[in-house]
């Protein structure tokens, strides 16, 4: 492998003279090739402390080229004239621009990786300073803008929000448990999961993502076509005589007051959110917290939804003052189909 | 794997017939010739002057220390400079410095290119294991994009909060947006945080001047905003 030559004057006189002789031959050879291949005129004058000035191609050739050069206007002569200094400055400028471009690309690549690692809960694997976090914040903004443009494009093209293939069979949850006992989950058109309220249950309006909006069981007016987030009911957490509903979580409050109480610059210091994937943390309260689209985006670590449709938890509603009672005498199991 | 280039081949030294090829060849060979001449001057302390006419009729010239001195010398003119030696020694020194700068920049470029290549290689290796959210925004469908926006907005809140916390830790006397601060602290300059204990290099992305600056700083006068 060839070694790199340090660009400075060769200290050893003998080596310098040898290099001079060899390189002089190389330059004249290159000039000859250039003039022959491109059919152009060229000349060179090389002088050194070791020997008389060398002219190429010949004294007459140089004089001819010089006279042609001098005939040109002064502006044209100086326009593309380079001294060794200007040549080097020009090269440095070009290389600096190239370096800036490469650094920007590499930095963006780093930030992209950092961003996805944060999303996947690998933030603790990195050491970072405030500058890195600020850059990351700017990069997230930039990335969100790209995503927004993409969403606009998809919306204008009338793309469906769900790209999953339609399920092979219609899944009905808790059909035998009696009317109103459990909501029926039916996969609707365009593979958009539709939760249809069971007979006798409180009315609920649900619109399939990308599908035509449906008003189910006497609900209010259908949702707008581009509104992708249906109204989500609160799911009861404890079933007793007094049904308790889970309160919506103030996520921002949680960020400001819970997570950062014990901040440390030590990279080994563990923060509550570092080991769990970020998305999992977001999905902790999927019904209150995250919209319809996020539920169906099929992120394995987000909500464990490995199916092509969304299945809300099957809830056995006991007789309460809030919910219609299951009267065994009037119960009829209906097979609901969505057209 | 298909070769990207034809590699080194023996070129027949005869005039090229194709005009476009000829122009490209001229540009490349001229650049190579001037580079060789530059190295030659630096390594051997030689003086050189070159004049090359392009196929389009333009004239290019290269000279060390410059073209005029050598042309005048060749034509037998005596240039009346009393301090020629002084000029020459200054030029030599300047060229030496420029060569040093050029070598450093070139080394940095190579380093960054290696980084880029290693990143690209890692990405190629992890391509199969790549999850959907790692794809380009244009490759995501509507639900994925919507989900990603939601997730990133929340991540941004966390990141901003954490950045402020880090600044407070590195400079506890700095109060955000306080008018009592006479001048910007050393750790912050015009809203750009320069404290960095991170693994990223300092020559990172510059802050967009149109971006809303954090921490109440005015980019023009670099004093904390009230």
Curated annotation (Swiss-Prot), chain A:
Residues 86-112 form a coiled coil. Signal peptide: none annotated. GO terms for biological process: positive regulation of transcription by RNA polymerase II. The keyword Transcription applies. It comes from the Eukaryota. Keywords: Coiled coil, DNA-binding, Nucleus, Transcription, Transcription regulation. Pfam families: SRF-TF. It is found in: Nucleus. GO terms for molecular function: cis-regulatory region sequence-specific DNA binding; DNA-binding transcription factor activity; DNA-binding transcription factor activity, RNA polymerase II-specific; protein dimerization activity. SUPFAM superfamilies: SRF-like. Residues 1-60 form the MADS-box domain. Disulfide bonds: none annotated. One of its GO terms (cellular component) is nucleus. Gene3D superfamilies: Transcription factor, MADS-box. InterPro entries: MADS-box/MEF2_TF, SRF-like_MADS-box, TF_MADSbox, TF_MADSbox_sf. Interacts with AGL61/DIANA and AGL62. Probable transcription factor. This is Agamous-like MADS-box protein AGL86.
UniProtKB/Swiss-Prot annotation, chain B:
Residues 108-131 are annotated as: Disordered. Residues 6-66 form the MADS-box domain. It comes from the Eukaryota. Residues 95-132 form a coiled coil. One of its GO terms (cellular component) is nucleus. It is found in: Nucleus. One of its GO terms (biological process) is chloroplast organization. Keywords: Coiled coil, DNA-binding, Nucleus, Transcription, Transcription regulation. One of its GO terms (molecular function) is DNA-binding transcription factor activity. InterPro entries: TF_MADSbox, TF_MADSbox_sf. SUPFAM superfamilies: SRF-like (SSF55455). Its main location: nucleus. Disruption phenotype: Embryonic lethality when homozygous. Residues 108-127 have a biased composition (Basic and acidic residues). Probable transcription factor that controls female gametophyte (megagametogenesis) development and chloroplast biogenesis during embryo development. This is Agamous-like MADS-box protein AGL23.
């Amino acid at each position: 492998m060839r070694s790199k030559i340090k660009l400075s004057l060769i200290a050893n006189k003998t080596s310098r003279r040898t290099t001079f002789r060899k390189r002089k031959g190389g330059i004249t050879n290159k000039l000859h090739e250039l003039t022959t291949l491109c059919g152009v005129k060229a000349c060179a004058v090389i002088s050194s402390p070791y020997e008389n000035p060398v002219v190429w191609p010949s004294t007459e050739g140089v004089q001819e080229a010089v006279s042609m050069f001098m005939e040109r206007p002064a502006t044209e002569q100086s326009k593309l004239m380079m001294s060794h200094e200007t040549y080097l400055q020009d090269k440095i400028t070009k290389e600096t621009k190239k370096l800036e471009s490469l650094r920007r690309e590499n930095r963006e690549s780093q930030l992209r990786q950092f961003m996805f690692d944060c999303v996947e809960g690998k933030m603790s694997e990195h050491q970072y300073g405030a500058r890195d976090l600020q850059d990351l914040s700017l990069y997230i903004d930039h990335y969100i803008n790209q995503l927004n443009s993409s969403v606009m494009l998809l919306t204008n093209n009338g793309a469906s929000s769900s790209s999953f293939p339609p399920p092979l069979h219609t899944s009905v949850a808790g059909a035998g448990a009696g009317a109103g006992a459990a909501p029926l989950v039916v996969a609707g058109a365009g593979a958009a999961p539709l939760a249809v309220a069971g007979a006798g249950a409180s009315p609920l309006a649900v619109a399939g993502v990308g599908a035509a909006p449906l008003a189910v069981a006497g609900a209010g007016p259908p949702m707008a076509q581009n509104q992708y987030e249906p109204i989500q009911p609160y799911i009861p957490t404890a079933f007793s005589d007094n049904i308790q509903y889970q309160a919506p979580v103030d996520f921002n409050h949680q960020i400001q007051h819970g997570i950062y109480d014990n901040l440390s610059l030590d990279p080994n210091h563990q923060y509550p959110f570092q080991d769990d994937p970020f998305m999992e943390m977001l999905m902790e309260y999927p019904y209150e917290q995250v919209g319809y689209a996020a539920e169906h985006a099929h992120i394995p670590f987000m909500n464990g939804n490995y199916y092509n449709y969304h299945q809300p938890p099957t809830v056995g509603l006991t007789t309460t003052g809030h919910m219609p009672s299951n009267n065994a005498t009037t119960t009829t199991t209906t097979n609901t189909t969505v057209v | 794997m298909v070769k990207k280039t034809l590699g080194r081949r023996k070129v027949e030294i005869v005039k090229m017939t194709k005009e476009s090829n000829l122009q490209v060849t001229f540009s490349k060979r001229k650049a190579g010739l001037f580079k060789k001449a530059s190295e030659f001057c630096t390594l051997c302390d030689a003086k050189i002057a070159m004049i090359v006419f392009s196929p389009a009729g333009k004239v290019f010239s290269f000279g060390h220390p410059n073209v005029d001195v050598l042309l005048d010398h060749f034509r037998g003119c005596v240039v009346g400079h009393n301090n020629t030696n002084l000029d020459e020694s200054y030029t030599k020194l300047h060229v030496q410095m420029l060569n040093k700068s050029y070598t450093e920049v070139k080394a940095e470029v190579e380093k960054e290119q290696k980084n880029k290549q290693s990143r690209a290689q890692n990405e190629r290796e992890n391509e199969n294991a790549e999850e959907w959210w790692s794809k380009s925004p244009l490759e995501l469908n509507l639900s994925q994009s919507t989900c990603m926006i939601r997730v990133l907005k929340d991540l941004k809140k966390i990141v901003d909060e954490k950045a402020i916390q880090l600044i407070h830790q590195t400079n506890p006397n700095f109060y955000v947006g306080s008018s009592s601060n006479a001048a910007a602290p050393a750790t912050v300059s015009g809203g750009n945080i320069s404290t960095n204990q991170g693994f990223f290099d300092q020559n990172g992305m510059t802050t967009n001047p149109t971006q809303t600056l954090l921490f109440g700083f005015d980019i023009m006068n670099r004093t904390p905003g009230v």
